[in-house]
Curated annotation (Swiss-Prot):
Species of the source: Staphylococcus saprophyticus subsp. saprophyticus (strain ATCC 15305 / DSM 20229 / NCIMB 8711 / NCTC 7292 / S-41)
Coiled-coil portions: none
NCBIfam families named among the record's database cross-references: metK
Entry keyword set: ATP-binding, Cytoplasm, Magnesium, Metal-binding, Nucleotide-binding, One-carbon metabolism, Potassium, Transferase
HAMAP family xref list: S_AdoMet_synth1
Protein name: S-adenosylmethionine synthase
Role this protein plays: Catalyzes the formation of S-adenosylmethionine (AdoMet) from methionine and ATP. The overall synthetic reaction is composed of two sequential steps, AdoMet formation and the subsequent tripolyphosphate hydrolysis which occurs prior to release of AdoMet from the enzyme.
Catalysed conversion reaction: L-methionine + ATP + H2O = S-adenosyl-L-methionine + phosphate + diphosphate
Family according to the record: Belongs to the AdoMet synthase family.
Pfam families: S-AdoMet_synt_C, S-AdoMet_synt_M, S-AdoMet_synt_N
EC numbers: 2.5.1.6
Length: 398
C-alpha cells in the first residue's frame, strides 16, 4: 500500500559551533549581569573568529562584570581549551566595545506610551516594548515535548554528540558539529519514520572515517533515536565530506543570532526574524517569543488544537500588543477567534506582564543558548509550564 508521503527536515548544531559559541557568550554575559542587576538593559553581541572574540552592543547596568573572564570561562566550558583545537580560551584575545542603551529607546521602555500619555500609574503598570516587531510561538502534539519531531531529534542528537565528547567516550571528537534530520509524514500528517540523518563532527586528524561512522552510529544515533523510527531505507550521512579537522571559529566566524531557526522550531513554524541571545527580557524579540510558545503549548495541551501557531506584534514604547493572531491549521476544536479571546483573558502579553508571568528577571538564559529554547527535557524553563490548561478549557466552554 502506498500513500502520499511528505518529508520535512530540520537541523541543530553543537555548542562548539561558531555561531552557538557566540550565542552562549552573549547569554553568559547577560546572566552574569542579571545576578546583581535584574533590571539591567542588555543587548550584547559576540563575534568569534580565529584567535579572538569581540563583544559589542549596548549595556546599561548598576553592576560590574569582568567580561573577558566570562568569555574565557564560557569558551573553556564548551571545550576549546587547546591551541591544536584551533581556538584556546586562555590565549585568545578578547576585545570589548560596549555603549549604554540609547536614551531614546530607554524613554519608551522605561515608561510605556500609555502611561506617559495618561499619567495613570494605577491603571497601567507596564513596560513599553523595547522595539517594534512580530514574534511567533508554536506547539504540536506530535511529540511529548509539544515540538515538531525533526527539530526535537536534531537537538537530541546534537546534545548526545557533545556528551560523548565531554564524557570522553569518543576522545577524538572536537567541539564543532552539526546534525540534520529528515522525517517522513503520512497522509494524516503524522511522523512515521526517519528518512535521513546527516551528522558532521569535528575530529582529531589521526582518525579514520570508517571508525567515525561506526562510532557515531553506536554511541550517538542508536542510543538517541527510537528504533521504531529507523528502518533499512533510512540513510545515514556521517561526515560526508570525508574530513572535518579544522572547525570552530578557526574554520568559520561565528556571530550572535545566526541560528534563529535552530533556536526555535527548525523551520516548521514561521519566525519573526529577531534573535534571542544577549537580550534582556524587556526585548520583546525574546520575551514575547517565549510568551507565544507558552500560549501555543497550553492551547495544544488543553486539546483545543493538535497544532497551534501564535503571532504577537508590538510597537516600540507601547505596552499592549498591536495584534494577537492564532492559526490552528484546521485542527482547532473551537474557532480561532474564541482562542484569541481566551488568550487575552488569561495571558498578560504586555512586556512587563510577560516578565512577571514567566519570572524572566533571573539568570536563566545561558542554558537556552544551545540545543534550543523550546521543548527542552534537560532544563526547566518557565515558558514550558502547562499551568493555563484548565483555564483555557473552562474559558472556551463558557
Amino acid at each position: 500500500m502506498t500513500y502520499n508521503k511528505r518529508l520535512f527536515t530540520s537541523e541543530s548544531v553543537t555548542e562548539g559551533h561558531p555561531d552557538k559559541i557566540a550565542d552562549q557568550v552573549s547569554d553568559a554575559i547577560l546572566d552574569e549581569i542579571l545576578k546583581d542587576d535584574p533590571n539591567a538593559r542588555v543587548a550584547c553581541e559576540t563575534t568569534v573568529t580565529t584567535g579572538m572574540a569581540l563583544i559589542s552592543g549596548e549595556i546599561s547596568t548598576t553592576t560590574y562584570v569582568d567580561i573577558p573572564k566570562v568569555v574565557r570561562e564560557t569558551i573553556k566550558e564548551i571545550g576549546y581549551t587547546r591551541a591544536k583545537f584551533g581556538y584556546d580560551s586562555q590565549t585568545m584575545a578578547v576585545l570589548t566595545a560596549i555603549d549604554e542603551q540609547s536614551p531614546d529607546i530607554a524613554q519608551g521602555v522605561d515608561t510605556a506610551l500609555e502611561y506617559r500619555d495618561e499619567a495613570s500609574e494605577a491603571e497601567i503598570e507596564a513596560t513599553g516594548a523595547g522595539d517594534q516587531g512580530l514574534m511567533f510561538g508554536y506547539a504540536t502534539n506530535e511529540t511529548d515535548t509539544y515540538m515538531p519531531l525533526p527539530i526535537f531529534l536534531s537537538h537530541q542528537l546534537a546534545k548526545r554528540l557533545s556528551d560523548v565528547r565531554k564524557d570522553e567516550i569518543l576522545k577524538y571528537l572536537r567541539p564543532d558539529g552539526k546534525v540534520q534530520v529528515t522525517v517522513e509524514y503520512d497522509e494524516q500528517d503524522k511522523p512515521v519514520r526517519i528518512d535521513t540523518i546527516v551528522l558532521s563532527t569535528q575530529h582529531a586528524e589521526d582518525i579514520e572515517l570508517d571508525q567515525i561512522k561506526d562510532d557515531i552510529k553506536t554511541h550517538v544515533i542508536y542510543p538517541t533515536v527510537p528504533e521504531s523510527l529507523l528502518d533499512e531505507q533510512t540513510k545515514f550521512y556521517i561526515n560526508p565530506t570525508g574530513r572535518f579537522v579544522i572547525g570552530g571559529p578557526q574554520g568559520d566566524a561565528g556571530l550572535t543570532g545566526r541560528k534563529i531557526i535552530v533556536d526555535t522550531y527548525g523551520g516548521y513554524a514561521r519566525h519573526g526574524g529577531g534573535c534571542f541571545s544577549g537580550k534582556d527580557p524587556t526585548k520583546v524579540d525574546r520575551s514575547a517569543a517565549y510568551a507565544a510558545r507558552y500560549v501555543a503549548k497550553n492551547i495544544v495541551a488543553a486539546q483545543l488544537a493538535e497544532k497551534c501557531e501564535v503571532q504577537l506584534a508590538y510597537a516600540i514604547g507601547v505596552a499592549e500588543p498591536v495584534s494577537i493572531s492564532i492559526d490552528t491549521f484546521g485542527t482547532g476544536k473551537v474557532s480561532e477567534y474564541e482562542l484569541v479571546e481566551a488568550v487575552r483573558k488569561h495571558f498578560d502579553l504586555r512586556p512587563a506582564g510577560i516578565i512577571k508571568m514567566l519570572d524572566l528577571k533571573h539568570p536563566i538564559y545561558k542554558q537556552t543558548a544551545a540545543y534550543g529554547h523550546f521543548g527542552r527535557t534537560d532544563v526547566l524553563l518557565p515558558w514550558e509550564k502547562l499551568d493555563k490548561v484548565n483555564l483555557l478549557k473552562d474559558s472556551v466552554k463558557a
